[in-house]
Design a protein with these regions (language model features):
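Conserved non-catalytic scaffold segment of RNase H-like nuclease domains
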Residues: 1-110, 114-115, 119-121, 145-157
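Short, glycine/acidic-enriched loop or turn micro-motifs at the edges of active sites
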Residues: 23-25, 129, 166
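Short alpha-helix plus adjacent loop in nuclease-associated cores
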Residues: 124-141
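Acidic, Mg2+-coordinating catalytic module of metal-dependent nucleases/exonucleases
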Residues: 95-103, 107, 111-112, 142-198
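Core beta-strand-centered patch of the WYL/Sm-like small regulatory domain
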Residues: 200-287
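Acidic two-metal-ion nuclease catalytic site recognized across multiple nuclease folds
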Residues: 1-11, 170-220, 224-228
Length: 287
């Protein structure tokens, strides 16, 4: 066993699961899983889980270009109702880790609710958060960039099993530098924090969010939170995510040029972007 691998058991004595998903889009509340993979590392050794998933819809060319999973590849694959229970059995109660875990676990959480499956007490950790804490010399923390910086071999980027393995390698190197405080800083939630949340319907006045997430377009929202209560603010919506405190919009705020979370219950209106908003985004992209 390498020093990197043995370090895992200092922090996770029972072992852990590194997982990754490929999906039809960025929003767990709107899109679907097309591949699930997990790497289980325990004191007994390493096990792998990997399965394509038939999403029940036709994927567009933009999705396929990212993960290279075609409609032909998934047409005879099992549906999520068959794959997710098997994956959860594989995972057991071990801690779950993923790169940008809120995204991947958002899809898992939504699937558990839709299929009325039990919510185990797994701890969930994010290797993006851990990387920000321990690789302070890096400016960017996308999985591919970390793999390059840390000299991790990547066979098939944007395929679930390979990305899960890269996530594991990032974790191994991160734990060589990490303290218990760093690990605490990468903790997100327990999976069963979500067991009583089941309202995933998007209200009518928020439907423009779905359109703009799909097109990666610009729009405005009126929001009851923050210092500019109910004033229109330009955003680029990226994803809708379930959280224990309620569903949120993850978006790029153009005024601050920061990525923020917005509680869906506090968004009072969705408005088309102005020409000024589009010009502002163009200038941000050009920097």
């Amino acid at each position: 066993m390498t020093n990197e691998s043995s370090k895992i058991f200092d922090f996770f004595p029972q072992g852990l699961i590194c997982l990754d998903l490929e999906t039809t889009g960025l929003s767990p509340l709107l899109n679907r899983i097309v591949e699930i993979a997990g790497i289980k590392i325990t004191p007994e050794g390493i096990e792998k889980f990997s399965s394509l998933v038939n999403p029940g819809i036709t994927m567009d060319a933009r999705n396929i270009a990212i993960h290279k999973i075609s409609n032909e590849m998934v047409k005879d694959s099992p549906p999520l109702s068959e794959v997710l229970p098997k994956f959860m059995e594989f995972a057991g109660n071990l801690p779950l880790l993923a790169h940008n875990a809120q995204f991947d676990l958002g899809f898992i959480i939504y699937g558990l609710h839709q299929l009325k499956l039990p919510f185990p007490h797994n701890k969930v950790f994010c290797t993006v958060k851990l990387s920000r804490l321990v690789f302070k010399e890096f400016a960017h923390f996308k999985l591919g960039i970390l793999a390059e910086k840390l000299k991790i071999q990547v066979k098939n980027a944007h395929r679930a099993e390979d990305d899960a393995m890269v996530c594991l390698e990032v974790l191994k190197q991160g734990l060589l530098r990490a303290s218990e405080k760093d690990l605490s800083g990468s903790f997100l939630f327990h999976l069963d924090d979500f067991h009583i949340i089941d309202n995933f319907e998007l209200k009518d006045h928020l439907k423009l969010l779905q359109e703009k997430i799909d097109s990666q377009g610009i729009m405005r929202i009126k929001y009851l939170g923050g210092s500019r209560k109910n004033e229109p603010r330009p955003i680029r919506p990226l994803s809708l995510l379930p959280l224990p405190q309620g569903n949120v919009l993850y978006a790029h705020c153009l005024d601050s040029n920061l990525y923020k979370m917005y509680n869906l219950n506090k968004i009072t209106e969705c408005i088309p972007a102005t020409e000024e908003d589009l010009e502002k985004y163009k200038k941000i992209e050009e920097k």
